Amino acid sequence: METDRSRALLVSLAACLVALPAAAQTIVPTPAFNAIELEGGGHVTLRHGSVQQVRLLKGSTRFTRFIMERSQPHKLRIEACDNDCPHDYDLEVEITTPGIDTLAVSGGGRIESGGDFPARHQLTLAVDGGGTIDVRAMSSEGATAAVDGGGRILVNAQRELTAAINGGGKIRYWGAPRLTEAVEGGGSVEQGY
């Protein structure tokens, strides 16, 4: 009798372990977008590809919301964690996209680009209340970067960069752009190396 229970428990455990990888990589259906906002933490990796796709690598759609608003129909807003998520909740999202124009992080978290993206005409980047945007792998002719209340942006701008920091933060840039900057309340805008 005890052996049957043990065997049943092992079979159940094995079934759960086999199901975990599938659950951990959920495709999230979304309409087309060219802007992303990450709210409340987590990690988003951008990869270049001809077909746009959002994959949830860690986390759950039970706790994380992927929102497209009528007022901004081309922006994907990712709310990392609702009120019910566990204390140690870990969110990781991979987005494959042909291109993106606007990225924002608020309340912590990280958005980074990986791989090779074709050069963009213009990027708009904003961090509010902590977090990081690292798009060094995504070259652009021009960029606007703003940090408010802490955080950092790493950007590859070739011709023009408008950089603003309010209340602390860092903006690092690669390339040789014409720089227009405003810093109030601490922070720095510096060439990367």
Predicted regions located by residue number:
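Acidic (Asp/Glu) and glycine-rich low-complexity loops/linkers
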Residues: 2, 23-106, 110-126, 137-141, ...
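Bacterial N-terminal signal peptides that target proteins for export
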Residues: 2-11
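N-terminal signal peptide c-region/cleavage motif recognized by signal peptidases
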Residues: 19-21
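Periodic glycine anchor positions in long extracellular repeat architectures
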Residues: 41, 107-109, 129-131, 149-151, ...
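Short cationic/low-complexity microdomains
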Residues: 151-174
